UniProtKB/Swiss-Prot annotation:
Residues 1-20 form the signal peptide. Pectinolytic enzymes consist of four classes of enzymes: pectine lyase, polygalacturonase, pectin methylesterase and rhamnogalacturonase. Hydrolyzes alpha-D-galacturonopyranosyl-(1,2)-alpha-L-rhamnopyranosyl linkages in the backbone of the hairy regions of pectins. It catalyses: Endohydrolysis of alpha-D-GalA-(1->2)-alpha-L-Rha glycosidic bond in the rhamnogalacturonan I backbone with initial inversion of anomeric configuration releasing oligosaccharides with beta-D-GalA at the reducing end. Belongs to the glycosyl hydrolase 28 family. Keywords: Carbohydrate metabolism, Cell wall biogenesis/degradation, Disulfide bond, Glycoprotein, Glycosidase, Hydrolase, Polysaccharide degradation, Secreted, Signal. It comes from Aspergillus terreus (strain NIH 2624 / FGSC A1156). This is Probable rhamnogalacturonase B. One of its GO terms (cellular component) is extracellular region. The active site is at D218 (proton donor), H293. The gene is rhgB. Glycans are attached at N144, N238, N253, N320.
Length: 526
Protein backbone atom coordinates (compact mmCIF):
# COMPACT_ATOMS: atom_id res chain seq x y z
CA UNK A 1 0.00 0.00 0.00
CA UNK A 2 1.38 3.35 -1.04
CA UNK A 3 0.31 6.00 1.46
CA UNK A 4 0.12 9.72 0.79
CA UNK A 5 1.58 11.99 3.45
CA UNK A 6 1.54 15.76 3.51
CA UNK A 7 3.38 18.22 5.65
CA UNK A 8 1.46 20.47 7.99
CA UNK A 9 2.25 23.31 5.63
CA UNK A 10 0.73 21.63 2.62
CA UNK A 11 -2.43 20.75 4.52
CA UNK A 12 -3.20 24.34 5.37
CA UNK A 13 -6.18 25.70 3.53
CA UNK A 14 -7.06 22.72 1.37
CA UNK A 15 -10.19 23.43 -0.63
CA UNK A 16 -13.37 21.35 -0.48
CA UNK A 17 -13.27 18.19 -2.52
CA UNK A 18 -15.63 19.65 -5.10
CA UNK A 19 -12.98 22.19 -6.05
CA UNK A 20 -10.67 19.51 -7.42
CA UNK A 21 -12.08 20.45 -10.85
CA UNK A 22 -12.08 17.14 -12.66
CA UNK A 23 -15.44 16.49 -14.27
CA UNK A 24 -15.21 12.72 -14.64
CA UNK A 25 -12.98 9.70 -14.93
CA UNK A 26 -9.46 9.95 -16.33
CA UNK A 27 -7.13 7.30 -17.69
CA UNK A 28 -7.30 4.34 -20.08
CA UNK A 29 -10.37 2.12 -20.19
CA UNK A 30 -8.50 -1.17 -20.39
CA UNK A 31 -5.25 -2.33 -18.88
CA UNK A 32 -1.90 -2.51 -20.61
CA UNK A 33 -1.72 -6.16 -19.62
CA UNK A 34 -5.04 -6.83 -21.34
CA UNK A 35 -3.83 -4.99 -24.41
CA UNK A 36 -0.60 -7.00 -24.44
CA UNK A 37 -2.55 -10.23 -24.07
CA UNK A 38 -4.55 -9.29 -27.15
CA UNK A 39 -1.45 -8.62 -29.22
CA UNK A 40 2.12 -7.46 -28.66
CA UNK A 41 4.05 -5.72 -31.42
CA UNK A 42 7.77 -5.57 -30.64
CA UNK A 43 9.53 -3.01 -32.84
CA UNK A 44 12.52 -5.35 -33.13
CA UNK A 45 10.29 -7.66 -35.15
CA UNK A 46 9.62 -4.84 -37.61
CA UNK A 47 13.19 -3.89 -38.42
CA UNK A 48 14.20 -1.75 -35.47
CA UNK A 49 17.63 -2.12 -33.92
CA UNK A 50 18.92 -0.80 -30.62
CA UNK A 51 22.10 0.47 -32.25
CA UNK A 52 21.49 4.25 -32.07
CA UNK A 53 21.78 4.33 -35.87
CA UNK A 54 18.90 2.44 -37.51
CA UNK A 55 15.86 4.67 -37.97
CA UNK A 56 13.08 3.67 -35.58
CA UNK A 57 10.44 5.65 -37.51
CA UNK A 58 9.25 3.04 -40.00
CA UNK A 59 9.42 0.06 -37.58
CA UNK A 60 7.45 2.02 -34.98
CA UNK A 61 4.80 2.93 -37.56
CA UNK A 62 4.58 -0.68 -38.75
CA UNK A 63 4.27 -2.04 -35.23
CA UNK A 64 1.55 0.49 -34.53
CA UNK A 65 -0.34 -0.48 -37.69
CA UNK A 66 -0.50 -4.08 -36.45
CA UNK A 67 -1.53 -3.18 -32.89
CA UNK A 68 -3.60 -0.02 -33.38
CA UNK A 69 -6.97 -1.74 -32.98
CA UNK A 70 -6.00 -3.48 -29.76
CA UNK A 71 -2.55 -4.31 -28.52
CA UNK A 72 0.73 -3.11 -27.06
CA UNK A 73 3.61 -1.66 -29.06
CA UNK A 74 6.87 -2.46 -27.30
CA UNK A 75 10.21 -0.64 -27.57
CA UNK A 76 12.65 -2.75 -25.50
CA UNK A 77 15.56 -1.32 -23.50
CA UNK A 78 18.39 0.03 -25.62
CA UNK A 79 19.33 3.10 -27.63
CA UNK A 80 17.31 3.91 -30.76
CA UNK A 81 17.67 6.57 -33.45
CA UNK A 82 14.62 8.44 -34.74
CA UNK A 83 15.29 10.08 -38.09
CA UNK A 84 11.79 10.06 -39.59
CA UNK A 85 8.98 11.16 -37.31
CA UNK A 86 6.20 8.79 -36.26
CA UNK A 87 2.60 9.92 -36.79
CA UNK A 88 0.40 7.35 -35.08
CA UNK A 89 -3.23 8.02 -35.94
CA UNK A 90 -6.51 6.27 -35.31
CA UNK A 91 -5.58 3.90 -32.52
CA UNK A 92 -8.08 2.34 -30.14
CA UNK A 93 -7.38 0.26 -27.03
CA UNK A 94 -3.63 0.35 -27.52
CA UNK A 95 -0.53 1.10 -25.49
CA UNK A 96 3.00 2.24 -26.27
CA UNK A 97 5.61 0.92 -23.87
CA UNK A 98 8.98 2.62 -24.34
CA UNK A 99 11.65 1.07 -22.14
CA UNK A 100 14.50 2.27 -24.34
CA UNK A 101 15.89 5.71 -25.11
CA UNK A 102 14.95 7.36 -28.39
CA UNK A 103 17.54 9.80 -29.76
CA UNK A 104 16.65 12.40 -32.36
CA UNK A 105 18.75 12.06 -35.50
CA UNK A 106 16.39 13.73 -37.98
CA UNK A 107 16.17 17.47 -38.56
CA UNK A 108 12.61 18.04 -39.78
CA UNK A 109 10.17 20.27 -37.93
CA UNK A 110 6.87 19.01 -36.59
CA UNK A 111 6.57 16.38 -33.86
CA UNK A 112 8.93 13.46 -33.32
CA UNK A 113 6.10 11.30 -31.99
CA UNK A 114 2.58 12.50 -32.82
CA UNK A 115 -0.36 10.51 -31.46
CA UNK A 116 -3.76 11.60 -32.75
CA UNK A 117 -7.39 10.53 -33.04
CA UNK A 118 -6.94 7.77 -30.49
CA UNK A 119 -8.86 6.45 -27.50
CA UNK A 120 -8.14 4.15 -24.57
CA UNK A 121 -4.41 4.79 -24.84
CA UNK A 122 -1.42 4.53 -22.52
CA UNK A 123 2.21 5.57 -23.02
CA UNK A 124 4.65 4.52 -20.32
CA UNK A 125 7.99 3.02 -19.40
CA UNK A 126 7.77 -0.04 -17.18
CA UNK A 127 11.24 0.76 -15.84
CA UNK A 128 10.53 4.47 -15.30
CA UNK A 129 13.68 5.13 -17.33
CA UNK A 130 12.40 5.16 -20.90
CA UNK A 131 13.16 8.51 -22.52
CA UNK A 132 13.24 10.73 -25.57
CA UNK A 133 16.48 12.65 -26.02
CA UNK A 134 15.91 15.52 -28.43
CA UNK A 135 19.52 16.78 -28.51
CA UNK A 136 18.08 20.24 -28.93
CA UNK A 137 21.42 21.87 -28.24
CA UNK A 138 22.44 20.97 -31.79
CA UNK A 139 19.80 23.46 -32.97
CA UNK A 140 20.20 25.94 -30.15
CA UNK A 141 23.94 26.47 -30.52
CA UNK A 142 23.11 27.93 -33.95
CA UNK A 143 20.37 30.12 -32.44
CA UNK A 144 17.67 27.95 -34.02
CA UNK A 145 14.61 27.58 -31.78
CA UNK A 146 12.14 26.20 -34.31
CA UNK A 147 13.12 22.54 -34.42
CA UNK A 148 10.74 19.64 -33.75
CA UNK A 149 8.65 19.04 -30.67
CA UNK A 150 9.25 15.79 -28.83
CA UNK A 151 5.75 14.49 -28.08
CA UNK A 152 2.29 15.74 -29.03
CA UNK A 153 -1.11 14.23 -28.36
CA UNK A 154 -4.05 15.53 -30.40
CA UNK A 155 -7.66 14.42 -30.06
CA UNK A 156 -6.81 11.60 -27.68
CA UNK A 157 -9.37 10.48 -25.09
CA UNK A 158 -9.21 8.22 -22.04
CA UNK A 159 -5.45 8.07 -21.83
CA UNK A 160 -2.45 8.08 -19.50
CA UNK A 161 1.15 9.15 -19.97
CA UNK A 162 3.49 8.24 -17.15
CA UNK A 163 6.89 7.04 -15.94
CA UNK A 164 8.59 8.65 -18.92
CA UNK A 165 11.38 11.20 -19.42
CA UNK A 166 11.63 13.98 -22.01
CA UNK A 167 14.99 15.70 -22.49
CA UNK A 168 16.35 18.65 -24.47
CA UNK A 169 13.65 19.22 -27.04
CA UNK A 170 14.60 21.48 -29.93
CA UNK A 171 11.19 23.09 -29.27
CA UNK A 172 8.31 22.16 -26.95
CA UNK A 173 8.50 18.97 -24.92
CA UNK A 174 4.89 17.81 -24.34
CA UNK A 175 1.67 19.21 -25.82
CA UNK A 176 -1.84 17.99 -25.00
CA UNK A 177 -4.02 19.42 -27.76
CA UNK A 178 -7.81 18.99 -27.66
CA UNK A 179 -7.62 15.84 -25.55
CA UNK A 180 -10.00 14.58 -22.87
CA UNK A 181 -10.11 12.35 -19.80
CA UNK A 182 -6.36 12.04 -19.47
CA UNK A 183 -3.76 11.65 -16.74
CA UNK A 184 -0.08 12.65 -16.90
CA UNK A 185 2.18 11.73 -13.98
CA UNK A 186 5.56 10.50 -12.79
CA UNK A 187 7.55 12.38 -15.40
CA UNK A 188 10.77 14.34 -15.60
CA UNK A 189 11.21 16.98 -18.29
CA UNK A 190 14.56 18.67 -18.71
CA UNK A 191 15.18 21.32 -21.36
CA UNK A 192 17.58 24.09 -22.19
CA UNK A 193 17.81 27.34 -20.28
CA UNK A 194 15.98 29.44 -22.85
CA UNK A 195 12.50 30.50 -23.89
CA UNK A 196 10.38 28.57 -26.42
CA UNK A 197 11.25 25.23 -24.80
CA UNK A 198 7.94 24.64 -23.01
CA UNK A 199 7.61 21.75 -20.56
CA UNK A 200 3.90 20.83 -20.56
CA UNK A 201 1.26 22.77 -22.51
CA UNK A 202 -2.35 21.68 -22.17
CA UNK A 203 -5.49 22.90 -23.89
CA UNK A 204 -7.96 20.11 -23.31
CA UNK A 205 -10.83 18.94 -21.11
CA UNK A 206 -10.81 16.89 -17.90
CA UNK A 207 -7.07 16.34 -17.48
CA UNK A 208 -5.14 15.45 -14.30
CA UNK A 209 -1.43 16.36 -14.37
CA UNK A 210 0.50 15.49 -11.23
CA UNK A 211 3.91 14.51 -9.93
CA UNK A 212 5.91 16.09 -12.73
CA UNK A 213 9.30 17.84 -12.61
CA UNK A 214 10.25 20.43 -15.22
CA UNK A 215 13.58 22.16 -15.82
CA UNK A 216 13.83 24.72 -18.65
CA UNK A 217 13.37 28.48 -18.88
CA UNK A 218 9.86 28.75 -20.22
CA UNK A 219 6.53 27.12 -19.39
CA UNK A 220 6.60 24.57 -16.59
CA UNK A 221 2.98 23.33 -16.71
CA UNK A 222 0.81 25.84 -18.55
CA UNK A 223 -2.89 25.86 -19.42
CA UNK A 224 -3.83 27.39 -22.75
CA UNK A 225 -7.20 28.14 -24.35
CA UNK A 226 -9.61 26.45 -24.66
CA UNK A 227 -9.43 24.36 -21.48
CA UNK A 228 -11.92 23.11 -18.92
CA UNK A 229 -11.63 20.97 -15.80
CA UNK A 230 -7.87 20.77 -15.43
CA UNK A 231 -6.27 19.63 -12.15
CA UNK A 232 -2.52 20.28 -11.81
CA UNK A 233 -0.82 19.24 -8.58
CA UNK A 234 2.45 18.09 -7.04
CA UNK A 235 4.50 20.01 -9.59
CA UNK A 236 8.23 20.70 -9.23
CA UNK A 237 9.37 23.65 -11.34
CA UNK A 238 13.08 23.18 -10.75
CA UNK A 239 14.94 26.08 -12.40
CA UNK A 240 12.17 26.65 -14.93
CA UNK A 241 10.01 29.33 -16.44
CA UNK A 242 7.25 28.53 -13.99
CA UNK A 243 3.58 27.65 -14.31
CA UNK A 244 1.06 29.82 -16.07
CA UNK A 245 -1.91 30.36 -18.34
CA UNK A 246 -1.64 31.80 -21.81
CA UNK A 247 -0.71 33.59 -23.83
CA UNK A 248 -4.42 34.49 -24.03
CA UNK A 249 -5.93 36.23 -27.04
CA UNK A 250 -9.32 36.48 -28.73
CA UNK A 251 -12.22 34.28 -27.55
CA UNK A 252 -10.39 32.87 -24.56
CA UNK A 253 -12.38 30.08 -22.92
CA UNK A 254 -10.83 28.65 -19.75
CA UNK A 255 -12.75 27.48 -16.68
CA UNK A 256 -12.56 25.20 -13.67
CA UNK A 257 -8.81 25.04 -13.24
CA UNK A 258 -6.96 24.04 -10.07
CA UNK A 259 -3.23 24.25 -9.42
CA UNK A 260 -2.16 23.00 -6.00
CA UNK A 261 1.00 21.79 -4.34
CA UNK A 262 3.29 23.65 -6.74
CA UNK A 263 6.93 24.10 -5.75
CA UNK A 264 8.91 26.63 -7.79
CA UNK A 265 12.65 27.12 -7.49
CA UNK A 266 14.77 29.78 -9.21
CA UNK A 267 12.27 30.34 -11.99
CA UNK A 268 10.75 33.25 -13.86
CA UNK A 269 7.56 33.11 -11.81
CA UNK A 270 5.40 30.94 -9.60
CA UNK A 271 2.29 31.71 -11.68
CA UNK A 272 1.99 34.00 -14.69
CA UNK A 273 -1.34 34.59 -16.44
CA UNK A 274 -0.51 36.59 -19.54
CA UNK A 275 -2.59 38.48 -22.06
CA UNK A 276 -2.59 41.75 -23.97
CA UNK A 277 -6.00 42.80 -25.22
CA UNK A 278 -8.08 39.90 -26.46
CA UNK A 279 -11.51 38.73 -25.33
CA UNK A 280 -13.29 35.88 -23.58
CA UNK A 281 -13.09 34.64 -20.01
CA UNK A 282 -11.02 32.76 -17.45
CA UNK A 283 -13.18 31.70 -14.50
CA UNK A 284 -13.36 29.39 -11.50
CA UNK A 285 -9.66 29.07 -10.74
CA UNK A 286 -7.95 27.85 -7.56
CA UNK A 287 -4.23 28.44 -7.01
CA UNK A 288 -3.31 26.94 -3.66
CA UNK A 289 -0.41 25.53 -1.70
CA UNK A 290 2.36 27.26 -3.65
CA UNK A 291 5.91 27.36 -2.31
CA UNK A 292 8.56 29.45 -4.02
CA UNK A 293 12.20 30.43 -3.57
CA UNK A 294 14.47 32.59 -5.69
CA UNK A 295 11.89 33.39 -8.35
CA UNK A 296 11.71 36.69 -10.21
CA UNK A 297 7.91 37.00 -9.99
CA UNK A 298 5.52 35.22 -7.68
CA UNK A 299 1.84 35.87 -8.50
CA UNK A 300 1.72 37.78 -11.78
CA UNK A 301 -1.57 38.37 -13.59
CA UNK A 302 -0.54 40.64 -16.44
CA UNK A 303 -3.12 41.82 -18.97
CA UNK A 304 -0.59 44.12 -20.60
CA UNK A 305 2.09 41.53 -21.17
CA UNK A 306 4.61 43.23 -23.39
CA UNK A 307 6.08 40.06 -24.89
CA UNK A 308 2.98 39.52 -27.03
CA UNK A 309 1.45 41.86 -29.56
CA UNK A 310 -1.79 43.58 -28.61
CA UNK A 311 -4.84 41.52 -29.58
CA UNK A 312 -8.20 42.90 -30.68
CA UNK A 313 -10.78 43.23 -27.91
CA UNK A 314 -11.30 44.95 -24.57
CA UNK A 315 -9.31 42.33 -22.71
CA UNK A 316 -9.77 38.86 -21.23
CA UNK A 317 -12.08 38.85 -18.19
CA UNK A 318 -10.85 37.03 -15.07
CA UNK A 319 -13.33 36.06 -12.34
CA UNK A 320 -13.76 33.80 -9.33
CA UNK A 321 -10.12 33.20 -8.45
CA UNK A 322 -9.09 31.80 -5.07
CA UNK A 323 -5.38 32.22 -4.31
CA UNK A 324 -4.60 30.47 -1.05
CA UNK A 325 -1.65 29.36 1.06
CA UNK A 326 1.37 30.81 -0.73
CA UNK A 327 4.64 30.75 1.20
CA UNK A 328 8.31 31.38 0.58
CA UNK A 329 10.56 34.07 -0.81
CA UNK A 330 11.00 36.03 -4.01
CA UNK A 331 14.38 37.16 -5.37
CA UNK A 332 13.91 40.93 -5.01
CA UNK A 333 10.58 42.27 -3.82
CA UNK A 334 11.51 45.90 -4.48
CA UNK A 335 12.07 45.14 -8.16
CA UNK A 336 9.28 42.60 -8.63
CA UNK A 337 6.77 42.37 -5.82
CA UNK A 338 5.06 39.12 -4.89
CA UNK A 339 1.56 40.27 -5.93
CA UNK A 340 0.93 41.84 -9.31
CA UNK A 341 -2.64 41.81 -10.61
CA UNK A 342 -2.98 44.06 -13.65
CA UNK A 343 -6.43 43.58 -15.16
CA UNK A 344 -7.82 45.16 -18.34
CA UNK A 345 -9.55 48.48 -17.86
CA UNK A 346 -12.09 47.32 -20.43
CA UNK A 347 -12.79 44.08 -18.56
CA UNK A 348 -11.98 44.43 -14.84
CA UNK A 349 -11.30 41.30 -12.80
CA UNK A 350 -13.79 40.45 -10.06
CA UNK A 351 -14.27 37.91 -7.28
CA UNK A 352 -10.51 37.64 -6.83
CA UNK A 353 -9.67 36.39 -3.33
CA UNK A 354 -6.21 36.13 -1.79
CA UNK A 355 -5.96 34.25 1.51
CA UNK A 356 -3.05 33.12 3.70
CA UNK A 357 -0.43 34.62 1.40
CA UNK A 358 2.94 35.26 3.08
CA UNK A 359 6.11 35.85 1.08
CA UNK A 360 9.19 37.95 1.66
CA UNK A 361 12.11 39.27 -0.32
CA UNK A 362 15.51 37.57 -0.36
CA UNK A 363 17.29 40.81 -1.23
CA UNK A 364 16.64 44.12 0.48
CA UNK A 365 14.03 44.92 3.11
CA UNK A 366 10.90 45.89 1.22
CA UNK A 367 8.45 44.57 -1.33
CA UNK A 368 5.40 45.87 -3.15
CA UNK A 369 1.92 44.73 -4.14
CA UNK A 370 0.16 46.27 -7.14
CA UNK A 371 -3.36 45.97 -8.55
CA UNK A 372 -5.25 47.55 -11.43
CA UNK A 373 -8.97 47.20 -12.19
CA UNK A 374 -9.15 44.19 -9.88
CA UNK A 375 -11.85 43.53 -7.28
CA UNK A 376 -12.03 41.09 -4.40
CA UNK A 377 -10.17 40.85 -1.11
CA UNK A 378 -6.54 40.77 -0.04
CA UNK A 379 -3.64 43.18 -0.42
CA UNK A 380 -4.35 45.83 -3.06
CA UNK A 381 -7.57 44.32 -4.42
CA UNK A 382 -10.48 46.74 -4.13
CA UNK A 383 -13.83 45.85 -2.60
CA UNK A 384 -17.20 46.70 -4.07
CA UNK A 385 -19.40 45.38 -6.82
CA UNK A 386 -19.49 48.12 -9.43
CA UNK A 387 -16.31 46.76 -11.05
CA UNK A 388 -15.30 50.08 -12.56
CA UNK A 389 -11.80 50.34 -13.91
CA UNK A 390 -9.11 52.08 -11.90
CA UNK A 391 -5.47 52.87 -12.43
CA UNK A 392 -2.76 50.78 -10.81
CA UNK A 393 -2.33 51.20 -7.08
CA UNK A 394 0.76 50.04 -5.21
CA UNK A 395 1.41 49.42 -1.54
CA UNK A 396 4.81 48.73 0.01
CA UNK A 397 5.71 46.47 2.93
CA UNK A 398 8.91 47.03 4.90
CA UNK A 399 8.72 44.11 7.31
CA UNK A 400 8.39 40.41 6.70
CA UNK A 401 4.94 38.86 7.13
CA UNK A 402 4.51 36.16 9.72
CA UNK A 403 4.54 32.60 8.51
CA UNK A 404 6.38 33.14 5.23
CA UNK A 405 9.09 30.56 5.94
CA UNK A 406 8.81 27.46 3.76
CA UNK A 407 10.90 24.35 3.12
CA UNK A 408 13.15 23.74 0.15
CA UNK A 409 13.71 20.53 -1.82
CA UNK A 410 16.86 18.44 -1.64
CA UNK A 411 17.00 18.21 -5.44
CA UNK A 412 16.91 21.97 -6.08
CA UNK A 413 19.37 22.58 -8.91
CA UNK A 414 22.42 24.74 -8.28
CA UNK A 415 22.88 25.67 -11.94
CA UNK A 416 21.05 25.53 -15.25
CA UNK A 417 22.00 23.28 -18.16
CA UNK A 418 22.59 26.04 -20.68
CA UNK A 419 21.38 25.60 -24.23
CA UNK A 420 24.48 24.80 -26.27
CA UNK A 421 25.75 21.55 -24.74
CA UNK A 422 24.19 18.13 -24.33
CA UNK A 423 21.80 17.77 -21.39
CA UNK A 424 22.01 14.50 -19.41
CA UNK A 425 18.97 12.29 -19.02
CA UNK A 426 17.72 12.56 -15.43
CA UNK A 427 15.95 10.05 -13.27
CA UNK A 428 12.35 10.69 -12.29
CA UNK A 429 12.24 12.03 -8.73
CA UNK A 430 10.28 10.40 -5.94
CA UNK A 431 9.14 13.72 -4.49
CA UNK A 432 7.69 16.73 -6.27
CA UNK A 433 6.47 18.92 -3.40
CA UNK A 434 7.78 19.21 0.17
CA UNK A 435 6.23 16.56 2.36
CA UNK A 436 3.98 15.08 -0.33
CA UNK A 437 4.31 11.52 -1.54
CA UNK A 438 3.43 10.96 -5.22
CA UNK A 439 0.02 9.43 -5.81
CA UNK A 440 1.58 6.47 -7.64
CA UNK A 441 4.93 4.85 -6.96
CA UNK A 442 7.31 4.74 -9.90
CA UNK A 443 6.76 1.61 -11.98
CA UNK A 444 10.47 0.92 -11.94
CA UNK A 445 10.43 0.82 -8.15
CA UNK A 446 7.64 -1.71 -7.98
CA UNK A 447 9.18 -4.68 -9.74
CA UNK A 448 10.34 -6.25 -6.48
CA UNK A 449 6.98 -6.08 -4.75
CA UNK A 450 5.62 -9.46 -3.85
CA UNK A 451 2.23 -9.15 -2.18
CA UNK A 452 -1.13 -10.02 -3.74
CA UNK A 453 0.16 -11.13 -7.10
CA UNK A 454 -0.83 -13.61 -9.71
CA UNK A 455 0.54 -14.56 -13.11
CA UNK A 456 -1.06 -13.29 -16.29
CA UNK A 457 -0.20 -14.92 -19.59
CA UNK A 458 2.01 -12.82 -21.83
CA UNK A 459 2.95 -14.77 -24.92
CA UNK A 460 5.07 -17.68 -23.71
CA UNK A 461 6.08 -15.96 -20.50
CA UNK A 462 4.30 -14.61 -17.45
CA UNK A 463 3.75 -11.14 -16.16
CA UNK A 464 3.17 -10.70 -12.46
CA UNK A 465 0.09 -8.61 -11.75
CA UNK A 466 -1.64 -7.18 -8.76
CA UNK A 467 -5.04 -8.71 -8.40
CA UNK A 468 -8.27 -6.99 -7.57
CA UNK A 469 -8.70 -3.76 -5.71
CA UNK A 470 -8.95 -2.06 -2.40
CA UNK A 471 -12.02 0.01 -1.86
CA UNK A 472 -13.80 2.46 0.34
CA UNK A 473 -17.45 3.42 0.27
CA UNK A 474 -18.04 5.91 -2.50
CA UNK A 475 -18.35 9.47 -1.28
CA UNK A 476 -19.29 12.66 -3.03
CA UNK A 477 -16.08 14.29 -4.16
CA UNK A 478 -14.04 11.09 -3.96
CA UNK A 479 -12.10 9.28 -6.63
CA UNK A 480 -13.71 6.02 -7.71
CA UNK A 481 -12.57 3.20 -9.90
CA UNK A 482 -14.52 2.75 -13.08
CA UNK A 483 -15.17 0.22 -15.81
CA UNK A 484 -12.88 -2.58 -14.70
CA UNK A 485 -12.13 -5.12 -12.04
CA UNK A 486 -9.18 -6.49 -13.99
CA UNK A 487 -6.00 -7.61 -12.34
CA UNK A 488 -3.25 -5.06 -12.25
CA UNK A 489 0.05 -5.66 -13.94
CA UNK A 490 2.73 -3.69 -15.70
CA UNK A 491 4.24 -5.08 -18.85
CA UNK A 492 7.96 -5.46 -18.31
CA UNK A 493 8.87 -7.11 -21.61
CA UNK A 494 8.90 -10.73 -22.71
CA UNK A 495 10.83 -12.08 -19.73
CA UNK A 496 10.28 -9.59 -16.96
CA UNK A 497 7.56 -8.99 -14.43
CA UNK A 498 6.21 -6.22 -12.27
CA UNK A 499 3.74 -5.61 -9.52
CA UNK A 500 1.58 -2.54 -9.28
CA UNK A 501 1.04 -0.90 -5.89
CA UNK A 502 -2.03 1.01 -4.86
CA UNK A 503 -1.68 4.74 -5.16
CA UNK A 504 -2.87 7.14 -2.54
CA UNK A 505 -5.79 9.49 -3.15
CA UNK A 506 -5.54 13.26 -3.20
CA UNK A 507 -5.39 14.63 0.33
CA UNK A 508 -8.65 14.19 2.12
CA UNK A 509 -10.21 12.04 -0.60
CA UNK A 510 -11.18 8.41 -0.39
CA UNK A 511 -10.80 6.39 -3.55
CA UNK A 512 -11.34 2.82 -4.54
CA UNK A 513 -8.14 1.63 -6.09
CA UNK A 514 -8.65 -1.19 -8.54
CA UNK A 515 -5.32 -1.25 -10.29
CA UNK A 516 -4.48 -2.79 -13.58
CA UNK A 517 -2.12 -2.81 -16.50
CA UNK A 518 0.41 -0.39 -15.12
CA UNK A 519 -2.40 2.07 -14.58
CA UNK A 520 -5.90 2.56 -13.25
CA UNK A 521 -8.92 4.49 -14.33
CA UNK A 522 -9.95 7.16 -11.87
CA UNK A 523 -13.45 8.47 -11.45
CA UNK A 524 -13.94 11.85 -9.84
CA UNK A 525 -17.28 13.23 -8.79
CA UNK A 526 -18.36 16.48 -7.23
Amino acid sequence: MHVNTLSVLSLVGLVPLAAARLSGSVGPLTSASAKAATKTCNVLDYGAAADKTTDLGAPLASAFADCKTGGLVYVPPGDYALESWAQLSGGKAWALQIDGTIYRTGTDGGNMIFIEHSSDFELFSSTSSGAMQGLGYEFHKDDNWSGPRLLRLYDVSDFALHDFILVDSPSFHLSLDTCSNGEVYNMAIRGGNHGALDGVDVWSTNIWIHDVEVTNKDECVTVKSPAQNILVENIYCNWSGGCGMGSLGADTNISDITYRNVYTWNSNQMMLIKSNGGSGTVSNVVLENFIGHGNAYSLDIDSAWSSMSTQSGDGVEFSNFTIRNWKGTEANGAERGPVKIICPNGAPCYEMYIEDFAMWTEEGDEQWYTCQSAFGSGFCLQSGSDYSSYEATTSTATSAPSGYSAPTMASDLTRDFGSTVSIPIPTIPTSFYPGATPYSALMGAQSSASANVRAVAFGTSAVVSRAGSSSRPAQTGSFLTKSTTAAAGSIMGPTAAAVQGVCAPPAGQGRGAARYGGHRRHGHRH
